[in-house]
């Protein structure tokens, strides 16, 4: 029987197996940020240990940064965490993309753009959305603070091998429908627990024509379906993306030959298989308090089925049967590790070009990294956004989570390109609706959701 991509990635990294069936995996890249690392570094100090492989560790500042003025950090805890990371990286000789550095940005944006993320690697980070890097054919997953310390000290991690889920995507997406809509559709149909105990492998004709930044969006939200990770077999698009980046292998051709072996064999069998035809897929909007509570833009909100639905409707201030077009939007956030890359900003800019944000709507664009921001400004995107009435911010996690000054006021609705819509995720009482960058941009213009497919704009990603 053939091997799945998961099998090949896993087997390449097993150091040993213990009597309980746990495998000790070697970790190729450890990404670090200011929130989940302080206790881990302190643990090293208390035991008089060092970081085993500083050269395989890379840190950045992202979660706590105030994106309006990155140098004016007024929150005491945020400043302490940022200062602590800076001191820890200096003491343990870990490379750091500090505030103002050209490499700084959201950890899951800078990894790929710097070439740190590569096919075949095991990648961990103390952050749920580490699965993003799986778009490159890497086995990438989030870990807890105690595991962060373990990896810092040993460059290994004890893990039980997950099962493999194959998700075949076939068909061609309509204009105005994106990877964000695919994953929201998957979650709405199968729920937030469908991937529990699995690694999701996305494959099929839709994936083959999808660009790398869209693939990252898919893998980023695999965790929202309960999966350990999301992966996509690397191909020519992957190799072209990695080649020439700062931390890409110097002996690139040798690595590329190894990367070509990273695919699921034709006779391999997945533990669970799902097939989705995306041809008739529509833009999605979440209405509730987890990412599976979503509907097509042309559907009414569902009826209540259980106490969770009842609580979600109450929290969100919505009613069953309500039209998605009638959901008010007071805030728009275009950013996060899900949708803050250059192509995301280009799409949003094409929607708002020459138009104005609806009066009473606060709209933010937060590039995912300094490099994304600079590239967008070279293209003049910041002028398009600012002339339309958007705020153009510095890179950081921003309004994705209520951990910095960028928050949604209690009881108000936000069209967000982020990945989670939990209660209080964007601030106490904030009401979050997950959408694609195109849908978020359009909502800013109208003050409510509209069907982006009916809008005239030139921001469709080419799937030719």
Swiss-Prot record:
Record PROSITE patterns: ACONITASE_1, ACONITASE_2
Binding locations of [4Fe-4S] cluster: 337, 397, 400
UniProt KW Iron keyword: yes
GO biological process: L-leucine biosynthetic process
Entry note: cofactor: Binds 1 [4Fe-4S] cluster per subunit.
One function term, GO molecular function aspect: metal ion binding
EC number assigned by the record: 4.2.1.33
Catalytic activities: (2R,3S)-3-isopropylmalate = (2S)-2-isopropylmalate
Gene3D superfamilies: Aconitase, domain 3
Pathway: Amino-acid biosynthesis; L-leucine biosynthesis; L-leucine from 3-methyl-2-oxobutanoate: step 2/4
InterPro entries: 3-IsopropMal_deHydase_lsu (IPR004430), Acnase/IPM_dHydase_lsu_aba_1/3 (IPR015931), Acoase/IPM_deHydtase_lsu_aba (IPR001030), Aconitase_4Fe-4S_BS (IPR018136), Aconitase_4Fe-4S_dom (IPR036008), IPM_dehydratase_rel_enz (IPR050067), IPMI_cat (IPR033941)
Highest rank taxon of the organism: Bacteria
SUPFAM superfamilies recorded: Aconitase iron-sulfur domain (SSF53732)
Subunit structure: Heterodimer of LeuC and LeuD.
Cited function: Catalyzes the isomerization between 2-isopropylmalate and 3-isopropylmalate, via the formation of 2-isopropylmaleate.
Family the UniProt entry places it in: Belongs to the aconitase/IPM isomerase family. LeuC type 1 subfamily.
Name of the protein: 3-isopropylmalate dehydratase large subunit
Organism this protein belongs to: Bacillus cereus (strain 03BB102)
